């Protein structure tokens, strides 16, 4: 009887794992390799350093925003160069450009109330706030 349960439960578990997608705050970027490399170079970050910093294992570290300023400036650079614009001409969030849902807009706005004035830290915080708000919605296709 136990084996029959496994026959039905195992495929269900596999299905759930296949539907689950790992999310990371940097999943928002539509990477252009040249822009990515230029942003790293401008901020004096090697590929190895970036890979170590951007791993899923460092997610709590990122969400606590205890990140060196050069990494925050790299995120600002990526936001400025990304094909999906989140920042207005003044370097501040633009919820219309971000195409947020009402729920995400409220959450992001509340989270950004205590955003730092410094533009690199501000941009980094915006990405973290959007991630916490579940924005953008990742398509399952």
Curated annotation (Swiss-Prot):
InterPro entries from the UniProt entry: PBP_GOBP_sf
Superkingdom in the source lineage: Eukaryota
Sequence similarity: Belongs to the PBP/GOBP family.
Residues spanning the signal sequence: 1-22
Cellular component, GO annotation: extracellular region
Annotated disulfide bonds: 39-77, 73-120, 111-129
Keyword Ligase attributed: no
Name the record gives this protein: General odorant-binding protein 57b
Gene Ontology MF, one: odorant binding
UniProt keyword list: Disulfide bond, Olfaction, Sensory transduction, Signal, Transport
General function of this protein: Present in the aqueous fluid surrounding olfactory sensory dendrites and are thought to aid in the capture and transport of hydrophobic odorants into and through this fluid.
Gene Ontology biological-process annotations: response to odorant; sensory perception of chemical stimulus; sensory perception of smell
């Amino acid at each position: 009887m136990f084996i029959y349960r496994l026959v039905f439960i195992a495929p269900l578990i596999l299905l759930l794992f296949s539907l689950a997608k790992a999310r990371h705050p940097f999943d928002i970027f539509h990477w252009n390799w040249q822009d990515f490399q230029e942003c790293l170079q401008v901020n004096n970050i090697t590929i190895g350093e970036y890979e170590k910093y951007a791993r899923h294992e460092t997610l709590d570290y990122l969400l606590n925003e205890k990140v060196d300023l050069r990494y925050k400036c790299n995120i600002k650079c990526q936001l400025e160069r990304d094909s999906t614009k989140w920042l207005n001409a003044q370097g501040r969030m633009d919820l219309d450009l971000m195409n947020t849902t009402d729920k995400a807009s409220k959450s992001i706005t509340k989270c950004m109330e205590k955003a730092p004035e410094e533009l690199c830290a501000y941009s980094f915080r915006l990405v973290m706030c959007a991630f916490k708000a579940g924005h953008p919605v990742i398509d399952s296709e």
